Amino acid sequence: MAREKIVVAGGTTKSWKLLLGLRIFAFMATLAAAIVMSLNKETKTLVVATIGTVPIKATLTAKFQHTPAFVFFVIANVMVSFHNLLMIVVQIFSRKLEYKGLRLLSIAILDMLNATLVSAAANAAVFVAELGKNGNKHAKWNKVCDRFTTYCDHGAGAIIAAFAGVILMLLVSAVSISRLLINSKNFSTTATTTSVV
């Protein structure tokens, strides 16, 4: 007796569960990256100069809003989180709907765009984080991570979560594309069968 695959919404039940699990993990990773980076702030009082023996101190604050790349990072991760949340809700509550043609294609394209978006944001944040950690001797930019260690550590955690989100979104895109291909093969097989009869 041959075991039949149950086809659900453009693929098998196994691919449906895999896609749902990947989306949930991608949602959690990108949301964690956005939250950690958006709450990233550290205030320090530093000696900026000395006059004679009297130190002159200044209180400085490092915030993610001070760097446009980190602002882009937060916005992009929030957008990808929202996309995944919306797709999770649609996937759970419309399980019995038929996903054909344009719907599957648009979902696959949106998944690829979101994978690209979170990848660009993570790479922009890595560039700025590297400048913060090592500075740039040629441009005479000083490093800041030797003074704002907590800020840099939280930023590194957010970047790691974002790269986990990138990997998960690439897997989501691969599964979405495979579901699209499976659906197009099923459609072409059905169309060939009906035209032969």
UniProtKB/Swiss-Prot annotation:
Q: Any signal peptide, and if so, which residues?
A: none
The chain's Cytoplasmic topological domains, given as residue ranges, are 2-17, 91-106, 178-197
Q: Which Pfam families match?
A: CASP_dom (PF04535)
Statement: the UniProt record of this protein carries the keyword Cell membrane: yes
Q: List the disulfide bonds.
A: none
Report the superkingdom from the record.
Answer: Eukaryota
Q: Where in the cell is it found?
A: Cell membrane
Indicate the quaternary assembly. Homodimer and heterodimers.
Alphabetized NCBIfam families for the sequence: A_tha_TIGR01569
Q: What is this protein called in UniProt?
A: CASP-like protein 1B2
Organism of provenance: Arabidopsis thaliana
